[in-house]
Curated annotation (Swiss-Prot):
Gene source species: Emiliania huxleyi
Family recorded in the similarity comment: Belongs to the PsbE/PsbF family.
Molecular function GO terms recorded: electron transfer activity; heme binding; iron ion binding
The entry's keywords: Chloroplast, Electron transport, Heme, Iron, Membrane, Metal-binding, Photosynthesis, Photosystem II, Plastid, Thylakoid, Transmembrane, Transmembrane helix, Transport
Gene from which the chain derives: psbE
The protein's role, per its UniProt record: This b-type cytochrome is tightly associated with the reaction center of photosystem II (PSII). PSII is a light-driven water:plastoquinone oxidoreductase that uses light energy to abstract electrons from H(2)O, generating O(2) and a proton gradient subsequently used for ATP formation. It consists of a core antenna complex that captures photons, and an electron transfer chain that converts photonic excitation into a charge separation.
Protein name as it appears in the record: Cytochrome b559 subunit alpha
SUPFAM superfamilies, alphabetized: Cytochrome b559 subunits
Lineage, uppermost ranks: Eukaryota, Haptista, Haptophyta, Prymnesiophyceae, Isochrysidales
Residue numbers binding heme: H24
Mode of membrane association: Single-pass membrane protein
Length: 84
């Protein structure tokens, strides 16, 4: 005797039902639209605290903020972030 039944509907029955496709034909495109709006409006930058592409380099600081000496890293970071 093979394994017992859990009483759940078989997956093949679910994906071939009209009800499944009516529900998912609305929800799946809605998720893509919501994601597009989340990114295109800039809300993603605000929500996650990442700088926008035009905010990586200021007019005063055009070089890459690179730490060169690991023993004086704290002082270098303070110098790099001064004026932010």
């Amino acid at each position: 005797m093979s394994g017992g039944s859990t009483g759940e509907r078989p997956f093949s029955d679910i994906i071939t039902s009209i009800r499944y496709w009516i529900i998912h034909s609305i929800t799946i495109p809605s998720l893509f639209v919501a994601g597009f709006l989340f990114v295109s409006t800039g809300l993603a930058y605000d929500a996650f605290g990442t700088p926008r592409p035009n905010e990586y380099f200021t007019q005063d600081r055009q070089q890459i903020p690179l730490v060169n000496d690991r023993f004086s890293a704290k002082q270098e970071l303070e110098d790099l972030t001064k004026g932010l």
